[in-house]
């Protein structure tokens, strides 16, 4: 069991309860020096008592819960001390335990110990951080599934298939003279193809994961006075942007966040894109163009009550290669625009003023970012997972080509299969380095 660590596990500030958490060798004896109860402390019981300082003066009263190894979050002996949530009390308790021999925990160190002690694999440990930082109900649901091992269930069988292949290759080398069962070339290719197929399915979730974690960057773009700011306000359901009939009212971008059926969206209302001699407006137009480049999805807004202009078509040419939705606004005034100019496009007709068509627009946004996320998402991969999966796939594609065309030696086959297996093992934390663990757990809050 490792040295004792201690941290305040609740957010800083005044509250009804504040928790001081300890884990490691001898933590119960350490805490008992200062926390006195009338009864013997038993694991998993709540014990009321008094916390005294190092001079024997009463500091606070509270409740102690002891978790005996290995039946704890970290897999070590743990103590959680529930005190009144006064920052001064919690800080003083922290000082007491540090002076008595505990070390201040590093960010994420409790979860790191849980991983090192086999209580969680690395994808589950990462899910703890995702769960704590979840900004939407959908993000919370998916993080909880991954904490329960949902992602691991998809990756571990792929690695086991590669390890099974490795075992056959090693047996072929070690017992070449003996009559043992071997796989045909076709069987090997089939097994590798099965792993590649599984990797491809996981890679499809990378974009979804990015959207759930960071939000979809959604830019509203169009010429001046087509109702971009009105649409911005309608989607936000509040009057955030100034709306007038004067072209060029919005001179700089405005950015807000909202949720569309559980998906976080970073919505940007851009300045109307046009040629202008006004210096301030020109700067706003350039900044708007930068936001267009950064956007995951563009809402290209036209005024359905007017003819399509050359300015509309010029902006459309600039954005049509990016993911976009054509939004015909102001349909409540009648449709005079020749929408055939956008032949082949799915055009969503809305009235930002009346609120019509907004539900259809929301559905179209979800389709563009990857499907109805609220119902279908069980797992998603992070950038770290995506990088390792792509590396594993690259190695397996190379192996398959060489195995089929060049009839590579068993020794070379072993190297490729081992490398691909190790990449998958790194996702699960079965292959790790201290640098990797330090990088992952440093993003956690202290006390978790």
Swiss-Prot record:
EC assignment: 3.6.-.-
Entry binding sites for K(+): 225, 244, 246, 249
Positions of GTP binding: 225-230, 244-250, 269-272
Cofactor: binding comment: Binds 1 potassium ion per subunit.
UniProt keyword Cytoplasm, yes or no: yes
Every TrmE-type G domain range: 215-370
One Pfam entry name: MnmE_helical
Any one GO BP annotation for this protein: tRNA wobble uridine modification
Cellular-component GO terms for this entry: cytoplasm; cytosol
GO MF term set: GTP binding; GTPase activity; metal ion binding
Chief localization: cytoplasm
Residue positions binding (6S)-5-formyl-5,6,7,8-tetrahydrofolate: 21, 80, 119, 448
Key words, A-Z: Cytoplasm, GTP-binding, Hydrolase, Magnesium, Metal-binding, Nucleotide-binding, Potassium, tRNA processing
Main EC class the enzyme belongs to: hydrolase
Cofactor list: K(+)
Cystine bridges: none
Top-rank taxon, per record: Bacteria
Keyword Magnesium set for record: yes
Compartments where located: Cytoplasm
Residues the record lists as binding Mg(2+): 229, 250
Functional summary from the UniProt entry: Exhibits a very high intrinsic GTPase hydrolysis rate. Involved in the addition of a carboxymethylaminomethyl (cmnm) group at the wobble position (U34) of certain tRNAs, forming tRNA-cmnm(5)s(2)U34.
Subunit structure: Homodimer. Heterotetramer of two MnmE and two MnmG subunits.
Stated family: Belongs to the TRAFAC class TrmE-Era-EngA-EngB-Septin-like GTPase superfamily. TrmE GTPase family.
Protein name (record): tRNA modification GTPase MnmE
Name of the gene this protein is made from: mnmE
